[in-house]
């Protein structure tokens, strides 16, 4: 964990953050804390790479820790209220038996202290003590107790007792667990017996019930003459704040953190290790595929769950040795916080420790869930009712965080859907028939067999009613209510279904009590196979939702009976004589025949059915980098998300190139509809486009296609035309396989990464993948692994898919009654979510860069329809290119700047954001994107993650008048850190390389990049200007006399001046002290310069009204003096939204408009405080409503005036008088112009200041 920890106070919760937070992280933490406090649900979108995982972990865990602190404080107050009533010492037998024990000493200490505090008569009472108590006073324990009592009562507080009360139960429980684990009964018990007891609820290891039963208080007989035993139990319960003893006030919710895959869990736990909360008790729930270490089970390719159960049952005479050692792993010091050595761990850490201790990681992780504060798991563990039941997950009153939740709707529907084939039903019926015929729980199995027989008979009868829907496919669909009528005919009703559930529970019991010779003994009973159990449990799960709440969800289901054909191979053995004369031919040995497959599908079309089980959850937080469009979540899930947020990305606009391309290199239109993708012209044009991009962009490139079918078509076509070979000459080409083993896919990824890492003759690699495939979900392609992402077309779901068709009709049917989106709109949203997920593979962290290329003519022709579905940070920067040539030229210039090793510092000194070649003037949207809007009185204290403030000296230029930047300052800056601002050369920046250094710059051996590094690391960021160096002045003056003809030459002089300034005024204070002063500056072109854009010559205007060198400069443009500000900084999340409209940017901020976006619920009504030990001294009045730092502008003009004054002294008297007169006129004009342009949206306070 980083030593530079920042502390923020949000909603009354102190959050320890491992570094200074991004604005998007502050907004997320504020939203989460508000949702947790108010029991509201949150829907938060934050782009990948913006640090949303850290924000989720720190905010949720800090809120949980605050509840522990409140509970501890409350228990200490309750103890102080209770102790005066227990002033008389206890006279029971249990106390007299342990006179000198620590418990007795503590009780006498508490009584004496209470008497002294309440009545003040403890001395008199001490004279009347009995002989036994007088004898006790002579012991060592009594002397120590007296010292403690004197210390506690002298301070008139109960700190010592509170601390002792909090520690003692933990030590006692730990000793009890050790005695319990190393007792002979536990060591010698059979694995089958332990497993059965746990299934029956007779043995619950480390649960609240078992801890209570094995507590020291229950080891002795309770005393009935006094309330000592109840007092002990009360103290014990108060120590365990997780128990719901006094209602919701003492119940501390667990945090269930769900992600999509196990690999994402590993990424989350790595982030947890960075935080101050890495010591919280945790566990990771996962499948046996990841955690089983048994050599036989783990090496098997079959169902590991079945093999594990067989070992636990000891069917083959062998038991699982690793299961016996679960307690050794769950109580190991590396996983327990009692030893203060606890750290966050990953599945790999648990597995390696389990192998070392020969203990089962799978069951150990489940045991650790009892005492864990945060539980990580794939989120289908929380949505699937069968998995929740098997893992014993209780979500009532808990906090559920679902990361990467863009597919949560599909996952919720799949969790409560079920499909079974006719052959599976027949196999289950035959096995149940076998149980009945052998008199094995005959009554129970008969009822289940009758249900399966009725269902198979109905399936056969219905198969004759199927309607052909395609080639060799036919189906028939029933609604849920219609299917209930059929179940009623089978004898399955809402009355008989609970009886069937009891029969199912009975047949799954592996043991049964049987009376033999007058004694009851447990006898093992055979049960049905795992395959039959899966069939029965799946059917009963669907029936449960169909009958639930008086068939409330029946209309949300569709039952589809599908008939398809499958080809099977009959590998018949060779039948030949010894001479092999009559051997069968090869084609006759491998016979293939077509078989009919009937599939019965119970499809849930409403994800709210699965989420109905989460109604008792305290707070649900859904977050992802690609939640957009966000309109469907509330209606689809049936959950009211009171808090919604679309956060901005943390990268600069110059780090990403986003463009749409509608034509190929040969000028053919590219529209990836089904009709066009079938033509050779489209396939060849896409191939030529892909080859051109690979030649211009180095390193790794990802290309996403809508479907595997199109991928196969393109690959076959390109191999036939030779284009595939041309691609392989440039890059290593890899195509994503459909299906296959995980190991094969991992091997292909390794080839891709190695081709980029170890460069040879080829420049990187090209990975052609499919949206919604393996590559587009959960994989991290950072830095050179994905310098460009190309998407071909829009990945709409298959319109001919029966489930998609039924879902669209379902939404159209209920769009008015339930507020669902229309079917067509839902259909489009599914496409954009998949597209955004594919685009999110690029730009994975703050310093990353890459290009996003959207190939389809529909984006340019109808942007209002097709662009609005993209993520917020992408749609704000989309540029439409008329032809492929201009797009490729702009893309090549973008890649050249970054691939040549030009760091962001020197790059950002010449540009603010990317504008393509066909853009003549920066648009209003682009100007909005170049800024982060701040409140006029809210200075931002930024961090190591934040942007770097503008550090260049600003000059007044006739043709360009750049305004100061508003980027927050004061953070640490590394080589990759840079500012947003500087003189903007938008028109030719993307197409022409950087101009060489001018003569002034060549005089120095140091580059502008070196100057920037030194300047950012050592120059104190302050609003008070420092004296300008002499060489800096001479440089500026020489620049003025030369009639500068280009902006680049002027920038060189300013950089040289700046470097000299930095070298002479390098501070001697530590770097940490240089981070304390922040100011905000904005780098957009001021409107006042528009009338001078046609002028060719640039010259520096001296300002005669500013003081000369050596004098104390004052703020001349807006005469406002800087004021010291309180250390606490206040934020609201909407301040960090840099996608506001131009009207909102130019008008004053309205308090009623403090919403995140477009009328959505407010994220932050309450301001949250950032507490820091660093001293802040920021002029509150320096920032206008539009984000311009007028104070800094005046400061920079002061520095320029010093240079100008030296130049004026060298002139003749006539020239000097003429120059000064010219300066005065220009300054007055400029002040008038500034008043027109900068007072737009200025607060009344600033307007009053300027008028003075």
Swiss-Prot record:
Biased composition (Polar residues): 920-930, 952-969
Top-level taxon of origin: Eukaryota
Subcellular location(s) per record: Nucleus
Any single Pfam family the record assigns to this protein: DEAD_2
PROSITE patterns noted in UniProt: HELICASE_ATP_BIND_2
Basic and acidic residues biased stretches: 989-1008
Major subcellular site: nucleus
Region Disordered, annotated ranges: 919-1008, 1212-1252
Coiled-coil annotated spans: none
Sequence similarity: Belongs to the DEAD box helicase family. DEAH subfamily.
Record protein name field: Fanconi anemia group J protein homolog
Organism of provenance: Gallus gallus
